[in-house]
Amino acid sequence: MFSRFSAFSIVFLILSSFGQVLAQVEFVEDSLRTRELDEVIITATRNERTMGALPMPVSLISNVKIRTMGSLRLNDVLTEQTGLVVVPQVNGQGNGIQLQGLNPEYTLILIDGEPVVGRNTGTLELSRLAVGNIKQIEIVKGPSSSLYGSEALAGVINIITERPSGSKYGFRSRYGSNNTMDLSGDVSYTNKKLGVYVFGNSYSTDGYDLSPENSGNTVSPFDNYTFSSKVTYQLGNRTDLSVAGRFFHEDQRFNFEVLQGNNRIQTSGIGNTQDWNLNPVVTHRFNSRLKAIGRFYATKYKSKTDLSFEADGGSYYNDELSQSFLRPEVNGEYYFNDKNILTVGGGYISESVQTTRYDDGVERFQYTSYGFFQHEWMPFAKWSVILGGRYDRSNIYGSQFSPKLSSQFDLNDKIVLKASVGKGFKAPDFRQVYLNFTNPAAGGYSVLGSAVAAERLAELDANGELLTSLDPSQIGDLEAEESFAINIGANIELLPGLKGDINLFHNQIDNLIETQIVATTVFNQNIFSYRNILRAYTQGLETNLNYPIIKNVKLSVGYQLLFAKDKDVKESVENGEVFYRDQNTLITRRLGSNEYFGLYNRSRHSGNIKLFYSNRQQGWEASARVIYRGKFGIGDISGNIQGETIPPSDRNSNGILDDYDDFVAGYALVNLSVAKSITSGFRFQLGIDNVFDYTEPVFIPNLPGRIMYAGVSYSFSKNGN
């Protein structure tokens, strides 16, 4: 933890550096006002295409911007992007990404086009992923990502890592609040045929405690390390080989006070997480028109947690999870002419999960074979169309076809119109069907899969352990989720240099799977299960503006408006069938149609304002970013977390989220960074995240408060750049 003197020193140095930065700003016309070259995107079509040629909402985050922001982990980067909301897991441990109002399990996270596995409670822990070796992050929103399978209903986030490029090496270190230390280094080597890139990262922290009156930390101390490499080799004039690998390991030390009856008991223990992947890829060009790619991807994720009683050392809690994923795939691209490009491919997935969270602990398997196609067609010079689809067949959910259609029309040099429409599908996963899990370390909450919930609740009720409960007969089998989505947008150059984009989206989901509280124990511990919301939708708009206001200074503004509702509830409200009880007068009233807020954990309004300064000649970089999230409801996580009682959001007990319920208030985070590079290859950086120290210990435990840091890096390349 920084001392007060250290904190004051960093604030003073940042403000002083900003003063030097502003003193060098020239209020003159800048060449950045001219049209910039489009970046290349791979994710949207599985092939390299420029952003300007893609008829669907896409965005790109470069490594230069990541470096200027001072981000260390993937969640730090994504939380500042328009339309992306980082949300905590139900137990307050970990972070997932919400895209277009859809839950984290509907956004596919890829590394170089391959999926990252290991979703606890449906959420992929984003902080597992270091950003030091990232070349760029590509984000594709909406159904145009259907080439990647049914899990990508909301979209795809693809992390493109560095490849071997010349002979160079670098080292980076950073120290900050909560005794957080980050060390990383990379080296690249290439000759005529061989290229090697190696990256390593070590990250450790003491965690943080937002509720010192309770025993234990909000986030316990942990340390992890990442090692990755990529080797490329030219097998012939037309054939290239690439082999990439990654290894991650984390250890965490727990100290919890848990409730057992009316007693508070001290426990402690350790947890570890480990994952690895291997990805060989062969690319062969038969001629100037035909290219084929064969790849094999293997990955495994393991996690284990052991807690013991501090009094006698006896075992209190054990949790283990192991997930494996294997996938061979072949795809080809045929270039007919400038107006027609065809991509076809297919593959096979073998996936297994074994965990103590299932009653029998038996390893369960799922096998899926699939094929996909995509035709890129340009009928006219200003009009392009992409038609594609994917067919999946699984031993669990049978078969499903997911089509997509996207189109773009260049109205003129300043306005480009885009639209995409598609269908998606997601079957209930292992967790939603078989889970039987209790986490005493986070207040004793339990999660039951649909196949075991009714039987387990009947047992608890017979033992007199339930305070309230749904009728077990109301907890039925889950049905597969089906989606239909549409995105309509435009890219517009409003003024020379002033560029904007807007995207209207609508996601219609039938049988949306959501968590619900099905019972509360006599110890005030919640029991969750899963249910299908028969008809739900998320819709709204996203917009961004970018403008180089003065030389070397770029301004960006982003905003999202979101409506997310259960259509059956909406119709009941409109028909006058839903009531609420006024908490002041105790009078029961009919709920108005405009008083139904919608689904939990969705903010109606969110946005960001960012300023970036870059003067390569003088070696200065700086940024000031404001991230806003509007109010949202939290009804699905009432209970005890870290010893604190969370009040239910639905305080008028009508079973929905309306304007008279409790909300988490909207908030804004302010982040600052400044960096100075010198000619010898060194770069120094100072920064403050969450300048005004906003925290919400109960409802938003993934916000650690004010974070101050200082870092230094060194880079060297053989050509002197």
Predicted segments with their positions:
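Extracytoplasmic beta-strand/coil segments of soluble accessory domains associated
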Residues: 75-118, 135
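N-terminal periplasmic accessory domains that precede
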Residues: 39, 74-77, 95-98, 125-130, ...
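Outer membrane beta-barrel strand-and-loop segments of large Gram-negative receptors
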Residues: 228, 317-331, 364, 370-372, ...
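Short acidic/polar hinge/loop motifs at secondary-structure boundaries
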Residues: 114-141, 229
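Gram-negative outer-membrane beta-barrel transporters
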Residues: 378, 504-509, 526-638
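Periplasmic-side early beta-strands and strand-to-turn transitions of outer-membrane beta-barrels
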Residues: 167, 174, 189-273
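Short, acidic, small-residue-rich periplasmic hinge/interaction motif at the N-terminus
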Residues: 24-67, 104
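Conserved C-terminal beta-signal and adjacent last beta-strands/turns
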Residues: 188, 199, 232-234, 593-721
